[in-house]
Amino acid sequence: NGDFSTNKGLAFSLRTRRLGNTKIDANYTLSYAGGTGSNADTGYRIAWLGGNDPTFTSPLNFDQRHTASLVIDYRTGNKGLLKLFGANMLFRYGSGMKYTPSKPRTAIFGGQLSDQPIAALNSGVMPSTFNADLRVDKTFMVNNVAVGVFCIVNNVFNNQMVTDVYNYSGLPDNDGYLTTQAGQNWVNDYSIGTQAFGEQLYNSRIAYPTNYASARHVQLGVRVDF
């Protein structure tokens, strides 16, 4: 197996002591991932399809140029009017992952076994992502028993974050099949009343939830320490 990959970049980290009630942790990474194969079976698939072995490096599937995170933690301690209260906010940013622009093909019907690229390997860039998570907690002392209540909110702003795309469009909800003659024939065959019905029917079939990260999620809980 002659495949290889390299990953190079820079990482920056800033951590503060607790200043008053607040502590900050910030991180940033600049990364370049390139090589001749993104996973262990890349060479096998090329040989199976009768292709030529790569002679130059390309961006890898997991090549992500920028990632950053910021944690802001606030704690009141055991003094003051709002004692034993805490809040933690986590912000995360990631630039888009790579994909290879390809000819349109159906994502739900059989036929074509693999994509047919129309541009350089992994030359397309998926949308970037931004997420924020929040945790708030408060502890009450009841007869030397610590009762803590907490609320965790994942994806606070309910951002729609794309995790995978179709190689034709670079979008999570368009595989390009309806732009082909075969796709138009399918729409005409399954349309009831209007062509729009057939298009909506097909698009509903390719709207995979796995192409998106989770929406806002709220958890409430109680913790007892004794």
Question: Which stretches of residues belong to each language-model region?
Answer:
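Intrinsic disorder/low-complexity segments enriched in polar/small residues
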Residues: 9, 117-120, 196, 220
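Weak global preference for isoleucine
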Residues: 10, 24, 46, 70-72, ...
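Extracellular/periplasm-exposed beta-strand and loop segments of Gram-negative cell-envelope proteins
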Residues: 1-5, 33-46, 52-63, 100-107, ...
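C-terminal beta-signal and adjacent terminal beta-strands/loops
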Residues: 79-113, 127-131, 138-226
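Gram-negative outer-membrane beta-barrel transporters
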Residues: 1-98
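Short amphipathic alpha-helical surface micro-motifs
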Residues: 51-52, 68-71, 115, 132-134, ...
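Hydrophobic, lipid-facing positions within transmembrane beta-strands of outer-membrane proteins
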Residues: 8-12, 56, 66-72, 130-136, ...
